Amino acid sequence: MNAAKVVEDLKMRFPNEPEYIQAVSQVLPTIEEEYNKHPEFEKYNLIERLCIPDRVLEFRVTWVDDKGNVQTNMGYRIQHNNAIGPYKGGLRYHKSVNLGILKFLAFEQTFKNSLTTLPMGGAKGGSDFSPRGKSDAEVMRFCQAFMNELYRHIGPDEDVPAGDIGVGGREVGYLFGQYKKLTHQFQGVLTGKGIPFGGSLIRPEATGYGTVYFLTSMLATRNIDIKGKKVLISGAGNVAQYAAEKCLQLGAIPMTMSDSDGYIYDPEGIDRAKLDYIMELKNVERGRIKEYIEEYPNAKYYEGKRPWYEKADIALPCATQNEINGDEAAALVKNGVIAVAEGANMPSLPEAIKIFQDAKILYSPGKASNAGGVSVSGLEMSQNSERLSWTAEEVDNYLKRIMNDIHENCVKYGTEADGYINYVKGANVAGFMKVAKAMMAQGLV
């Protein structure tokens, strides 16, 4: 395989999907050496088969707003690869959603799910509908209209969606209710469900907790304790909230949180009471992060900016893709950050990743460090299949073990000659090899 040539060919075929091309171009060079050790991969054109989704579903979603006006949005489901298990990946409701973004997410999800060691393929879906500013009734009607089409393409052994940006417990509940009404079946066809109807304990916390568990494993390779470390966190949604919670539990000090309008910096640190306020603000009141300074006036709010120029020890980007550019990465390194663990999907631009790696700081890509969410989704699928509910302690112990296993695989495949652990290479090679071997064993399908 010539990785550069494959990327150029894909650019020509998909010129209007920059996020997808970015994801592929970041992965292929890191697996090129390992791929070329296996001539049978090239014979069966494995890399092109892995890069291009099995199936791309596009559909119209028509719904009625509270004023009686008919609205139309686009719906998507990218079923990328099911070589190691049923398609698995979240649904994103955000105005930025398009085919290129979802193809990048589905591609990344395939590697991430492989890393978990659980039998799950890769997928992603969603819509350019945004729940922000919509009434609860409007969100319900949209979710029902979305499921009216999606239900034909999913199932507990076929494709199991979950939540993502804009799709939380409320939306998953509406989607599941409509699926049940349409099919007359109560199945584990969605994960992230409420506890009373088949959800798993620790699922809301899993991505944030898992990111911090992975971070502590990274720090341990250099005999560094997380206790007392100052942490920059972006985002204020599910991932950011529970990453902050786990940091607090382990003695670290969250200093920032953000949303799409700007970020807050609290020089005193965000303690338990302050985090509870943020959770109430974002999850119940659906407010904006700038309201934090009204409650805690010693904090500062920066409109339209991101938190990466602040001084701290650790950075946890937990908001969205491409949120750290080269200048921001250089500022993080200059200001003494020793570790960056991605809680979001592909939040660091390629030039930012290069700066982190050139500086030899600890850096992990999202497919490794944020795999806790889909890991517990897999555990939710297991509980649904068994008709059992595990305790929070049981699920959390599974999560810790899975994140530790992912870290060990990254170290195995990513340790370089000078001892530096290239987590990007390690995660990509480890995830790729499992999927590649499964695809080879199953023939040209």
Where are these regions (language model features)?
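Phosphate-interaction motifs
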Residues: F59-M120, K124, D128
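Flexible, glycine/charged-enriched surface loops at secondary-structure junctions
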Residues: I21, K37-Y44, T117, I154-G163, ...
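Glycine/serine-rich phosphate-binding loop and adjoining beta1-alpha1 elements at the start
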Residues: H94, N113-K227
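Rossmann-like adenosine-cofactor binding region
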Residues: G262-Y363, A368
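Structured beta-strand/loop patches that form or line metal/cofactor-binding pockets in enzymes
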Residues: F41-N69
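Adenosine-phosphate binding glycine-rich loop
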Residues: N2-A23, M218, V333-V445
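Glycine-rich phosphate/diphosphate-binding loop of Rossmann-like nucleotide-binding domains
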Residues: T191-G194, G199-K311
